[in-house]
Amino acid sequence: MKVNNNIKTTLRVAKIELNSMFYSPVAWLVLVIFGFQIGMSFAEVFGDQLRYQDMGYELWQVTTGIFTGMRGILPPIQRYIYLYIPLITMGLMSREYQSGSIKLLYSSPVKNTSIIFGKFLSMMVYGFALIAVLGVFVLFSAITIVNFDYSLVLSGMLGLYLLILAYSAIGLFMSSITKYQVVAAIGT
């Protein structure tokens, strides 16, 4: 019974955090910029593959070239995702400290673990939204490429999701040790 209440509390905290996250323009702006960056990279790499085909070159390992190759779209995402995640995680706990609502949370029957897991769960959902943006381009590629390598792309997406979660955990930690959002973002 007690575990069930902790899970309900964690889900309630995650829902509140997701609502506040998506009411702010920062989460939407990061999502749009992330999608734009992926779209530009994908259009360039996919266009190169089409030009090679038009010039009569034999195409091989198209999935590798588009997604994980030297000019693929997953390596730049891995290099730049650390710029996006701190913008979201910087306010997870810092907002609570600045507004003074952290005192209310500590005095309520909500446990610290439920607060932290709820905030991390909201970042898991946001990370899934980022991966869903990438999934649109993966779906387009799966439809247009004849021998699409699903295992390569899905394992790359899983790795990217886990990287987002690792950065989210670091950002949540940095946000919990300082009440200033800028310090939390720079520390992440």
What are these regions (language model features)?
Residues 87-106, 120:
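Transmembrane helix boundary and interhelical loop/hinge segments in multi-pass membrane proteins
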